[in-house]
Amino acid sequence: SINLYDFGCMRIFKSKFIQGVIDLYFALQKNDEALAVHAYEQWGFDDITKEKLDILSKWANFLYAPLMKDKVQKIQESDSGIYGAQIASEVHKELKKIGGVKPPKEFVFMDRAAVGLGSVFMHLRAEVNWYKVFHELIENFDQKKLTEKQQSTLKLVNL
């Protein structure tokens, strides 16, 4: 197992946000724009126009790409982060053209974690069936149960 710590910080993602991660996965898989808009709204984005949706989905398609195929593969075909940096640059430029976007705080933390973990898996040259792993992780996800568990755990530690 690999444990990553963000300089001693602990991130708590609300169940609604986690549900948005799952919903966006299925939205991208099924090319379901309404579900994608709903997912982004669960993350805290607002005013999702068709143009903004298309731009945000470029980045999402990059991040979710390894989860889309049921096969053993690297997290990214290239062993460098150049492709990801190019996608990020394109998305940034396109968002700037339409007036920008204020990313929700949780999105920034999740994005950092995804990029960081992706980098670790690239350097390890890990070949995994990411689709299978993701489906095993989300198989029994229950937003209500997670909310209850988070609330009781945070209360237990006075947070």
Regions found by a protein language model. Name each.
Residues S1-L159:
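Helix-rich C-lobe and terminal helical cap/extension of kinase-like folds
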